[in-house]
């Protein structure tokens, strides 16, 4: 059976026992109100997935392969990125810390604290379409602060998601880009999470922390139980202080080892002195050991922090290519576990994108993002970001000015009036400033 036939069969797939499960509101111990927590990989589903993957070669790029909808999360990757910002109290604590080393440790703790925020089942976020945007905000997160987030899919092949985060009252901003590259590895698939984020603390002389991400592995896609693992090295470094963290996300060996373990160190790159050792599990408790004193303490307890979810404008105020509006029919079908409709709705979005891409080629029109501009060759320290928000932010400005500036870029708050400037390509708006 060919790849197309396998995908067509998905339209006929209906989950057995679904009605009974909905009545009890529980499937495999998870609340059906959140279908992202439900493992829907039954025997037929695994057979379909195996039929698709059996036609692939190890190392093959999966970005152009249409995967069955029962492994999809009910959100776009642009929204999934906001998981990093859902433990804001830890970031604000780091910002309040005056000691350079302790501040670095606190920044690392904040960054490690968010990796456990994910569906209980193995789910993959929806691939954003070119020009898709997701904007959101947080009110009164801590210390009387608010936060704003703007994101845009700046490239589709390869997929590149640019994002910007700002806490005006605390003079904190984050510029980042995520470039996931999927690979087939036999009984596993891998999402190589390329891209970097730059966290800037304006209250500490614009101190910048550069950080990347661990890679994501999905095990057991051909046989065995599907399991998501984080693997490989994650780095956090601050050039101003010379402090660096190297965190190794351990993957379980075939015979020995354990799931979800991390090991790492914090060192001073200027002196090569190793200051701390990090151990634990990224989805449970992580500890830090001072190598001078031998004292060990909890760095992060993931159960002690409750994620603060972002807020978005009402659906009726959103534009056609804002994530939640664009994917609403697909997401609604996924929530009902109606994979026939979910597949059809997802295909409709993707088919429209193919038509738009063809029209751009026919018309000789090049796509340009409207919120993010390309980094130019003179911006040496920003090269790994590739794209940045088009407006320059002076973190010395007062919070009111910073808030006005971020709201002038994109519609974020409920009731915010649409401005025609929002639609102008970012590089043109940057040239005018």
Swiss-Prot record:
Miscellaneous comment: The C.albicans mating-type-like (MTL) locus contains, in addition to the genes for the regulatory proteins (MTLA1, MTLA2, MTLALPHA1 and MTLALPHA2), a and alpha idiomorphs of a phosphatidylinositol kinase (PIKA and PIKALPHA), a poly(A) polymerase (PAPA and PAPALPHA) and an oxysterol binding protein-like protein (OBPA and OBPALPHA).
Pfam families referenced in this protein's UniProt entry, alphabetically: Oxysterol_BP
Keywords annotated in UniProt: Lipid transport, Lipid-binding, Transport
Encoding gene, per UniProt annotation: OBPA
Position of the signal peptide: none
PANTHER family per the UniProt record, alphabetical: OXYSTEROL-BINDING PROTEIN, OXYSTEROL-BINDING PROTEIN-RELATED
Name of the protein described by the UniProt record: Oxysterol-binding protein-like protein OBPa
Gene3D superfamilies: 1.10.287.2720, 2.40.160.120, 3.30.70.3490
Organism: Candida albicans (strain SC5314 / ATCC MYA-2876)
Example of a GO MF term: sterol binding
Gene Ontology, cellular component aspect: cortical endoplasmic reticulum; cytosol; membrane
GO term, biological process aspect, one: exocytosis
């Amino acid at each position: 059976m060919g790849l197309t036939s396998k995908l067509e069969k998905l339209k006929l797939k209906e989950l057995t026992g679904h009605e009974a499960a909905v009545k009890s509101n529980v499937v495999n111990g998870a609340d059906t109100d959140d279908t992202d927590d439900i493992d829907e990989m039954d025997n037929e589903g695994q057979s379909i997935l195996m039929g698709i993957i059996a036609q692939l070669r190890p190392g093959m790029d999966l970005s152009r392969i249409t995967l069955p909808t029962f492994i999809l999360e009910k959100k776009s990757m642009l929204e999934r990125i906001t998981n990093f910002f859902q433990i804001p109290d830890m970031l604000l604590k780091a910002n309040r810390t005056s000691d350079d080393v302790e501040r670095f440790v606190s920044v690392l703790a904040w960054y490690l604290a968010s990796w456990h925020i994910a569906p209980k089942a193995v789910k993959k976020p929806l691939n954003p379409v070119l020009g898709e945007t997701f904007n959101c905000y947080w009110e009164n997160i801590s210390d009387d602060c608010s936060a704003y987030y703007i994101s845009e899919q700046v490239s589709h092949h390869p997929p590149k998601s640019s994002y910007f985060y700002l806490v005006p009252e605390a003079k904190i901003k984050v510029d980042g880009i995520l470039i996931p590259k999927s690979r087939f590895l036999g009984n596993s698939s891998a999402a190589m999470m390329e891209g970097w984020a730059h966290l800037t603390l304006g209250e500490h002389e614009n101190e910048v922390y550069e950080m990347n991400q661990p890679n994501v592995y999905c095990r057991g896609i051909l046989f065995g139980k599907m399991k998501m693992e984080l693997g490989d090295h994650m780095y956090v470094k601050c050039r101003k202080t010379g402090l660096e963290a190297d965190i190794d996300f351990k993957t379980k060996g075939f015979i020995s080892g354990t799931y979800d373990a991390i090991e790492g160190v914090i060192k001073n790159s200027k002196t090569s002195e190793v200051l701390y050792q990090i151990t634990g599990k990224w989805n449970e408790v992580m500890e830090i050991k001072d190598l001078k004193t031998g004292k060990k303490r909890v760095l992060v307890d993931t159960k002690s922090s409750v994620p603060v979810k972002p807020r978005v404008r009402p659906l009726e105020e959103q534009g056609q290519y804002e994530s939640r509006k664009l994917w609403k029919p697909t997401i609604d079908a996924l929530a009902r576990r109606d994979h026939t409709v979910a597949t059809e709705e997802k295909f409709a979005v993707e088919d429209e994108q193919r038509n738009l891409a063809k029209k751009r080629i026919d018309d000789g029109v090049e796509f340009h993002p409207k919120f993010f501009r390309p980094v130019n060759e003179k911006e040496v320290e920003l090269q790994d970001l590739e794209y940045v928000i088009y407006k320059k932010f002076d973190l010395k400005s007062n919070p009111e000015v910073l808030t006005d500036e971020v709201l002038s870029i994109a519609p974020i708050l409920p009731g915010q009036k649409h401005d025609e400037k929002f639609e102008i390509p970012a590089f043109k708006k940057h040239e005018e400033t």
